[in-house]
Amino acid sequence: MSKSSNAAQGRLAGRVALVTGAGPGLGGAIALAMAQEGANLVVCDINSEALSHTEKALAATGVECLALRCDVSDSAAVDAMFSQAFERFGTVDILVNNAARVPTSPAEESRRNRHYAYLTTPMERQSLGIVASLSDEDWLKWWDVNMHGVFFCTRAALRIMEPRRSGKIINIASIAGLGTQSMHSPGYSATKAGVISLTKTTALDVAGANIHVNAIACGAVLTPPFQAYLETATAAQRNSLFQLIPTGRIGQPAEYASLAVYLASDDHYLVGQVISPNGGAVI
């Protein structure tokens, strides 16, 4: 049986999924997993070159794909993207809010190292100086993509889903939004906590229209940026990180993608839930 035949019989056959932040990494893995289950895809990313890799992978599955460059922090750009998706496919059945800014700058790496040392090395208890050192720009930059982008895309999707009384929205959150697992980046943690709260309030709002909204609070994901960090980290830094995860390893994008497919399907009764695959880092 061909790949296209398998997709035609998949759990998401005939549906249209829109995945943001769909370049290589978690978003691309989610898009590919949904295509393999039969969904047609609208994929977007702010990086056109990164998006082209996902577009090629999706083409090999035999499903239809619309790839669009979009800055999700721009509400007008988001509305235009959904208009193009609707014009092409006539609906959007599934939304995956994956696009996010992650802490990767040199200053953020320094904060990360201080945080890991605090957790794993005996030292005098003192302030890490992280929050007090943040500039207005350091703080505000997180909200445009991680919070506003999720809201803009959710609003646009609901304008399509509510009249049809059907839809699935999956928000990609983080264990950083559940506790202090990203203490080195207060802005990231705060926005991911905001995504969790928005998930619950939106779920309550639209459940009566048969629209199910849930979140995945990811633990560490072995994406290209995370792999790059591991390659530059010292052995001691890597060991300290792995000691924080009971399974002793980082989660693969495909492991998270399979959960997203499940939440996009009709195989569950979940509404407003936050599911956290994290290797036991948070229990």
Q: Where are the language model's segments positioned?
A:
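A glycine/serine/threonine-rich, flexible loop-to-helix segment
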Residues: 8, 108-115, 208, 220-245
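Canonical Rossmann dinucleotide-binding motif of NAD(H)/NADP(H)-dependent dehydrogenases/reductases
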Residues: 10-42
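C-terminal substrate-recognition "lid" of short-chain dehydrogenase/reductases
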Residues: 89, 166, 249-277, 282
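Catalytic Tyr-X3-Lys loop
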Residues: 101, 111-152, 166, 170, ...
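Active-site helix of classical SDR
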Residues: 154, 191, 199
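Alpha-helical segment proximal to the catalytic Tyr-Lys
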Residues: 159, 204-205
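Residue(s) in the substrate-gating loop at a strand-loop-helix junction
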Residues: 174
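Short, small/polar-rich loop/turn modules that mediate ligand/substrate recognition or access, typified
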Residues: 207, 212, 270-272
